[in-house]
Amino acid sequence: MTYKPLPDSLTIKSSSINGLGLFATQDIKDGTQLGITHILINDEIIRSPLGGFINHQDNPNCVRIPVGNKSYLHTIKQINQGEELTLKYTIYKV
């Protein structure tokens, strides 16, 4: 098995929101799980590229869903090719 930091449907590029961001390279359906954003190991949080490059927006198109010691990124809206993926930043537990 080969580790891929991002699914084929995403890329990292310059964002008008802040610095770099995650962008869709193809249309992504509402309700799609995109991968792991964070992993909790021995009280330390490891952040993946999905967790590190997604920018904040008050009206986001993604949410983070915790399952056990991992958090997953899920779309909550249809995301069109070229559109930036966003998340509403909150204080959370992994």
Question: PLM ranges: what are they?
Answer:
Residues M1-V94:
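Conserved catalytic SET/PR domain of SAM-dependent protein methyltransferases, capturing the structural core
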